[in-house]
């Protein structure tokens, strides 16, 4: 085991504070409408220009291991806030820095850190309750536009996101992709889509677009691989007699079965398209069941005693239209039972609540949205790749902020709500003096986001904070026009969820830093740093930063 360096008490806490300040100072310059950008060096390719707190935080590693511990803890604040709320990462870093700074001053002056922590926790709990009680629900398209515009710092993006939400609903899937052109546009795909296309290009109906369109088709859904024509001949004859088109969704279609389908298609006997089933394993079974419920059919599976060669038209689904491209299938207006679809949606929502895996949650949300009806794609375009990446990050943040606003409502933005709730903390009556100090630390920290927004706008932050304190609730500082105004009336709003999550995460990590007494890190051998360091464990290879 390598030797360790250990630092104690004041030295430990001040080292961590230096790390906290290094990361927070790099991130805080981006806060507010007049916040600046940060340029990140990339080992390969051009530098990355960003205005996104968590992206900046993820890039920061400090040389001193003790300072780096402080920086990594603030990085965790930003990352955790991003994971839960999707936005507010810079605010969380600014709050964490303010709590750490004020808290360490009091610990140095003799306050007991454990009692301080208790006061901080009580103050945060009361503040969160108050933020929730002040939240206003987001119902109109205009309110959604305001939230998205503030987060992205761009009204055009705000309008795009509002349009997307209006078209696919609040549970709908909205994806952000890089455009090949310079413009940013919205594309909406109606109905359920999945990433599988036609098995054979001979099945297309439109050679110009290289896609197949089936009007009012029957849909055969099976988890089986179809290779023998005898398996599907009975159902093909029934569909032919009904005079309908047919979409086959199966694990695979090959051999004589595929040849028969292609020949009948080319002769004009039957308009048929075969696609592979989406997903893998248990997820494939679930997605096939989703498609069956959406279209009013059944999954023909031997697991439930259904065989392909015995299947009748009653097992087939129906849809108004199906469009099949090279690598995508879109089922428009499935004819499934509305009650069955509602029950399936409720079941998926319950699974989303119960799952602990981020990956599973993401896939379940995709299934929910596809079943609920529609996918919107925002194609991001710009003059250069650097600008496009920066814009894409802003749109993703704005999208997350908008979802959070729809979930828990909105509060006055620009750090106003934090200042508005400070008087509520006066009602807390802690028993111990150090606990009261913990409450005071939060009261002071709640001013930090507004102060930073004002400073970034070139205005004295302390004066702005005092002015907002004297103003009626909801009146804040519009940093863009440098006017004091009714924030919700002016459309300057923040999602309540983002506001509370940022504070809760910042206080949680900051309180842990305040209660730290000892730091242990691997000893850095200054003689060998960066060199080969002999063959003894190849100790110096760490200096060869070639990857």
From Swiss-Prot:
One of its GO terms (biological process) is protein refolding. It comes from Desulforudis audaxviator (strain MP104C). The keyword Chaperone applies. This is Chaperonin GroEL. Belongs to the chaperonin (HSP60) family. InterPro entries: Chaperonin_Cpn60_CS, Cpn60/GroEL, Cpn60/GroEL/TCP-1, GroEL-like_apical_dom_sf, GROEL-like_equatorial_sf, TCP-1-like_intermed_sf. Forms a cylinder of 14 subunits composed of two heptameric rings stacked back-to-back. Interacts with the co-chaperonin GroES. The gene is groEL. ATP binds at residues 30-33, 87-91, 414, 478-480, 494. Its main location: cytoplasm. HAMAP family: CH60. Signal peptide: none annotated. It is found in: Cytoplasm. It catalyses: ATP + H2O + a folded polypeptide = ADP + phosphate + an unfolded polypeptide.
């Amino acid at each position: 085991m390598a030797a360790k360096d250990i630092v104690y008490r004041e030295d430990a806490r001040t080292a961590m504070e230096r790390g906290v300040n290094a990361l927070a100072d790099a991130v805080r310059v981006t806060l507010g409408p007049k916040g600046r950008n940060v340029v990140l060096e990339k080992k390969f390719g051009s530098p990355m220009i960003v205005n996104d707190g968590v992206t900046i935080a993820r890039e920061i590693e400090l040389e001193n291991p003790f300072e780096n511990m402080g920086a990594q803890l603030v990085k965790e604040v930003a990352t955790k806030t991003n994971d839960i709320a999707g936005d507010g990462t810079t605010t969380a870093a600014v709050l964490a820095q303010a709590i750490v700074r004020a808290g360490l001053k009091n610990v140095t002056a003799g306050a007991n850190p454990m009692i301080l922590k208790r006061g901080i926790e009580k103050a945060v709990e009361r503040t969160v309750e108050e933020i929730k009680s002040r939240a206003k629900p987001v119902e109109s398209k205009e309110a959604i536009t305001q939230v998205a515009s503030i987060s992205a710092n761009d009204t055009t993006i705000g309008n795009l996101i509002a349009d997307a939400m209006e078209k696919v609903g609040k549970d709908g899937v909205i994806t952000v992709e890089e455009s090949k052109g310079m413009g940013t546009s919205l594309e909406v795909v109606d109905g359920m889509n999945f990433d599988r296309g036609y098995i054979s290009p001979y099945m297309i109906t439109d050679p110009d677009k290289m896609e197949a369109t089936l009007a009012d088709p029957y849909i055969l859904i099976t988890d089986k691989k179809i290779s023998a024509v005898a398996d599907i001949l009975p159902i093909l004859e029934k569909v032919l007699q009904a005079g309908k088109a047919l979409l086959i969704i199966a694990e695979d279609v090959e051999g004589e079965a595929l040849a028969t389908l292609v020949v009948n298609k080319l002769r004009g006997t039957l308009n048929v398209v075969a696609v592979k089933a989406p997903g893998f394993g248990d997820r494939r079974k679930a997605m096939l069941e989703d498609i069956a419920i959406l279209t009013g059919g059944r999954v023909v599976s031997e697991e439930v005693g259904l065989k392909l060669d015995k299947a009748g038209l009653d097992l087939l689904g129906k849809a108004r239209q199906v469009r099949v491209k090279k690598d995508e299938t879109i089922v428009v207006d499935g004819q499934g039972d509305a009650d069955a679809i509602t029950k399936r949606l409720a079941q998926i929502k319950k699974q989303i609540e119960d799952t602990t895996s981020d990956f599973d949650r993401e896939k379940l949300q995709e299934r929910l949205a596809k079943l609920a009806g529609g996918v919107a794609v925002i194609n991001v375009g710009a003059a250069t790749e650097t600008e496009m990446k920066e814009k894409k990050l802003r749109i993703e943040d704005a999208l997350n902020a908008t979802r959070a606003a729809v979930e828990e409502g909105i509060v006055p933005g620009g750090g106003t709500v934090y200042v508005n709730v400070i008087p509520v903390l006066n009602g807390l009556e802690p028993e111990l003096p150090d606990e009261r100090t913990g409450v005071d630390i939060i009261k002071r920290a709640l001013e930090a986001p507004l102060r930073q927004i004002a400073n970034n706008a070139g205005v004295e932050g302390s004066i702005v904070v005092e002015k907002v304190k004297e103003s009626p609730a909801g009146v804040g500082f519009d940093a863009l026009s440098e006017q004091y105004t009714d924030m919700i009336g002016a459309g300057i709003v923040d999602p309540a969820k983002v506001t509370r999550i940022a504070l809760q995460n910042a206080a949680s990590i900051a309180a842990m830093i305040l209660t730290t007494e000892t730091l242990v890190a691997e000893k850095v051998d200054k003689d060998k740093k960066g060199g080969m360091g002999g063959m003894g464990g190849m100790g110096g290879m760490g200096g060869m930063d070639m990857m």
